[in-house]
Amino acid sequence: MHKILEKRQLSYDKERDQSVFYYKVQAPEIARNRKAGQFIIFQIDDNYGERIPLTIADANAEEGWIAIVFQTVGATTRRFSVNFNEGDNVPVLVGPLGKPTHIEKKDGAVLCIGGGIGIAPLHPIVQANHAIGNKVITVIGARTKDLLFFEDEMRKASDELIVVTDDGSYRRKAVVTEPLKEVCEREKVSEIVSIGPAIMMKFCVAAARPFGVPITTSLNTIMIDGTGMCGCCRVKVGNETKFVCVDGPEFNGYEVDFDNMMQRMTAFKDKEREADHKCRIGLDAGKKA
């Protein structure tokens, strides 16, 4: 069992009725062994239920905890946010999984770009690059001010932090591809790391292409076992089929088929809606009677 040490709500999206939560969870072995870019899979039931992959957003090996950040986009994440609080135990927590981010000393800057919930998995990559002395320029963005989080954490680990919102409600009105282009134009950038919604990463790749800067994207697909057996997380990368859970989650952005990935991620939307549905047959009729 893994005890929840801290629970915080980071943001709430009124338009979509979705929240972002931060959980600090006791997990000594994972905290000792994890590296930037790796993820865990959790379940809220011992034997049944959906398995949710989440990149580790932070960790402390000495204190034995990891931090996970998730958005309440479906039935399982909603149940997790409502039913699990500080002092409770997460029944199943497996990790660290996936290949870690390749961190090395660069001649130029490392440009790290996070959008929406993608800000959370970007955080340890920013930290790791900062720790070895790379110049880190970080861009974080969201649709509106209320959906931003980790600003202070990112500023602490970055040489420069650029914050943008789609509607201009906080800091600069822009989408993340605009500062991407500006930074690449003004100085030497050795690598770009982009994490966020698939459509955002697709446009970041398109914006980076004219500059010829290597770009790494971290993919968050549907997963079940996390070992490559089920094939649910397969994506097209170059001319090959890759499994996000074992080959990733990070891939060369220029080679990822984002259109195919986005299509596959809609495969279970109908089932997700059914999971949230509450049958009221007979109940409403009884009220009318």
Spans of features found by a protein language model:
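Ferredoxin-reductase
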Residues: 1-88
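Short, surface-exposed secondary-structure boundary micro-motifs
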Residues: 45, 95-96, 238
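FNR/FR-type flavoprotein reductase catalytic core
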Residues: 76-224
